[in-house]
């Protein structure tokens, strides 16, 4: 909103014309979000400590995690607040795509908050009922996607990565498909958030990549040149993505091993919802399988473990999600984390390659 006020005075003071450029506002929003998160961080963490919002640790988890008991959780609230203010200042809030992403992000964050609250208040790791959580996530994502399709003309066609001008129009079924993408991404990120800094960096990498996709899909000339779908107004989402990356960096300052704070479900679900909604709006739903490969593998490891145990009584992994399997296999926590970061970078580069390799 601030940028609109500044830009409105451009006739009297021509240098203010720079605020009409998405790139300029992206850089300003980035540093605004980082500074807010970095400055607020110590105060936010202290507040969580005073309220005794400590993390409950699973009894069946790795023994090395016992020392993490009591570490403040619900730090995802710091990320959300640090992104909201820059968005209100530097993003066009009249853009329906922006509202769609923010509603999903904050809606999923609210579900995560309720889940975290139940965990810290009851001092166990159970939290909100899985059925209630999933119902809320599908309701929010389904309504947002349906509204964007009906009122904004969001395409119901699903593009195929690495293939030029190939898409499948799902029609009315697209809303269900898109909701599955958003909910699946959110819960995959949630499962990944089990080690210090493990989830936030892949989230930042994915957000930066999707932010770039948002910029090019929102730019008619670039989208036409690359022969990718053009989504009117998607460029503004690159600013939102920049705030997520920046706030993530600010959060990592405190979340890096050994963590001073955990993001909790309020963080993992909201950030996962953000990534899923960005993938849907930029029409990169299937590409998320590549870009979010780390999240996909983590989720599949849990699904495989559950199915195997129910059908055969045996476990495929020593413990799921798979990062715990590696921990119990003797790898140190920091080595697992950094290797997952490296994999995320490689997958992001591969995803960006689809812009030309079609």
From Swiss-Prot:
It is a multi-pass membrane protein. The keyword Magnesium applies. It is found in: Cell inner membrane. Pathway: Cell wall biogenesis; peptidoglycan biosynthesis. The keyword Ubl conjugation does not apply. It catalyses: UDP-N-acetyl-alpha-D-muramoyl-L-alanyl-gamma-D-glutamyl-meso-2,6-diaminopimeloyl-D-alanyl-D-alanine + di-trans,octa-cis-undecaprenyl phosphate = di-trans,octa-cis-undecaprenyl diphospho-N-acetyl-alpha-D-muramoyl-L-alanyl-D-glutamyl-meso-2,6-diaminopimeloyl-D-alanyl-D-alanine + UMP. Catalyzes the initial step of the lipid cycle reactions in the biosynthesis of the cell wall peptidoglycan: transfers peptidoglycan precursor phospho-MurNAc-pentapeptide from UDP-MurNAc-pentapeptide onto the lipid carrier undecaprenyl phosphate, yielding undecaprenyl-pyrophosphoryl-MurNAc-pentapeptide, known as lipid I. This is Phospho-N-acetylmuramoyl-pentapeptide-transferase. It comes from Bdellovibrio bacteriovorus (strain ATCC 15356 / DSM 50701 / NCIMB 9529 / HD100).
